[in-house]
């Protein structure tokens, strides 16, 4: 099995620019992203860094939670990444990065545009959100290694708290970020 990747420079640069918005959840969110990116690389059989589109999407994929204070965070996250790509004249990445973000909570497998990156990213996020209960064939030992290298720092607890608050506010729409 591959060795975990220890640094994702593009992701870190983006997270640094949003550190104030993310606040005390920064380390937990960063480690979530690092776990997801490592699971993505393992699922794809990548050795080394994933492409720039993936690193950018990973940094922004849940960011709307903090910038817009909502669990319905996919549209705000796409808005933020669109502004980011525009400011760097990287418009050619918009479609793929948007698909990566918008479809990462899709309940069923993803088979549309950019499926070669979107589907493993969706699976990698699910591996992390499920705390490794869902593995998509990754060895349990690899998942545990990545989890120990990049500890939770309260990330899953924060998600549970936000989900409970969302359920109380909107019991008919408790998990707005999920897609069929």
Regions inferred by a protein language model and the residue ranges of each:
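Divalent metal-dependent phosphate-bond-processing catalytic cores, especially two-metal-ion Mg2+/Mn2+ enzymes
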Residues: 2-9, 19-47, 60, 89, ...
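An active-site-proximal "capping" alpha-helix that borders the catalytic cofactor pocket
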Residues: 36-40, 72-87
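His-Asp-centered metal-binding catalytic motifs of divalent-metal-dependent phosphohydrolases/nucleases
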Residues: 50-68, 77, 98-105
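Glycine-rich, flexible beta-strand/loop modules in the N-terminal catalytic cores of phosphate-handling
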Residues: 15-16
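Membrane-interface starts of transmembrane alpha-helices
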Residues: 90-95
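Hydrophobic alpha-helical segments of small multi-pass membrane proteins
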Residues: 81, 102-103, 125-126
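Short gly/ser-rich anion-binding loops that grip negatively charged ligand groups
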Residues: 26, 67, 71, 87
């Amino acid at each position: 099995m591959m060795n975990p990747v220890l640094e994702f420079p593009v992701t870190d640069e983006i997270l640094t620019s949003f550190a104030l918005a993310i606040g005390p959840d920064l380390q937990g969110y960063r480690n979530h992203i690092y776990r997801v990116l490592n699971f993505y690389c393992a699922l794809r059989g990548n050795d080394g860094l994933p492409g720039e589109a993936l690193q950018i999407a990973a940094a922004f994929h849940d960011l709307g939670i903090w910038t817009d204070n909502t669990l319905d965070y996919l549209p705000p996250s796409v808005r933020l990444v669109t502004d980011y790509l525009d400011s760097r004249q990287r418009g050619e990445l918009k479609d793929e990065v948007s698909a990566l973000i918008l479809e990462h909570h899709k309940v069923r497998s993803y088979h549309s545009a950019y499926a070669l990156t979107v589907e493993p990213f969706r699976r990698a996020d699910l591996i992390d959100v499920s705390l490794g209960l869902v593995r998509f064939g990754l060895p349990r030992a690899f998942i545990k290694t990545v989890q120990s290298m990049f500890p939770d720092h309260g990330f899953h607890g924060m998600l549970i708290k936000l989900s409970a608050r969302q359920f109380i506010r909107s019991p008919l729409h408790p998990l707005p970020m999920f897609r069929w």
